[in-house]
A protein has these predicted regions:
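C-terminal/domain-terminus segments
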Residues: 25, 105, 109-138, 142, ...
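Acidic, carboxylate-rich catalytic segments that either coordinate divalent cations
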Residues: 145
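Acidic/histidine-enriched, glycine/proline-rich intrinsically disordered or flexible terminal extensions
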Residues: 155-169
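Flexible, glycine/small-residue-enriched loop-and-beta-strand segment within the central core
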Residues: 2-13, 18-111, 140, 148-149
Length: 169
């Protein structure tokens, strides 16, 4: 049982965050995990371009979050053992996961993507573009399927009142 943290000095973790076994977080330029987050087993986060995960996020098993990606056109060298000066087309762009996002199992998120608040991403989807807030996405590539109810916002407020009350007691 283990979770690996590479460049841990580049990783910040908030309150009430759980990282399950067999996860790998590679700090890169920075990974910031806010509060009330669950990262299920087998999640890989590559922080070469930066990753921000806001409050109340659920990341299901075997999700890959890439904020850096090699070039697949043949115009650059690849592999981590090769210095970046030989990778002129390396893509680095921050991934931002908004509040109250749920990411289904087996999802891959590519560099530069922002998941809007309340987004839900269906299992085994490939997210290549930003998502709208309070929307359900699925597929390869992920496309909007439906809207998501915002009813949970009231529950979130109730939870925070109770949680903060317990913390200050």
């Amino acid at each position: 049982d283990w979770a690996r943290f590479y460049s841990p000095e580049k990783i910040t973790i908030g309150n009430n965050v759980r990282v399950d076994d067999f996860c790998m977080l590679s700090g890169g330029v920075g990974i910031e995990l806010k509060d009330h987050i669950h990262i299920a087993c087998g999640v890989y986060m590559y922080g070469g371009g930066g990753i921000l995960v806001e409050d109340f996020v659920g990341i299901s098993t075997h999700v890959n979050i890439w904020s850096q990606s090699d070039d697949f056109s043949g115009r650059s060298m690849f592999c981590p053992q090769i210095p970046e000066k030989y990778k002129p087309h390396l893509k680095k762009a921050k991934v931002h996961i908004g509040k109250q996002v749920l990411i289904g199992c087996g999802v891959s998120i590519l560099p530069g993507v922002t998941l809007g608040e309340g987004s839900i991403i269906g299992a085994h989807s490939l997210v290549t573009k930003d998502t709208l807030p309070w929307s359900l996405y699925a597929g390869v590539p992920a496309k909007k399927i439906d809207n998501v109810s915002q009813d949970m916002l009231k529950l979130r407020e109730q939870f925070l009142e109770e949680y903060d009350g317990k913390r200050s007691a």
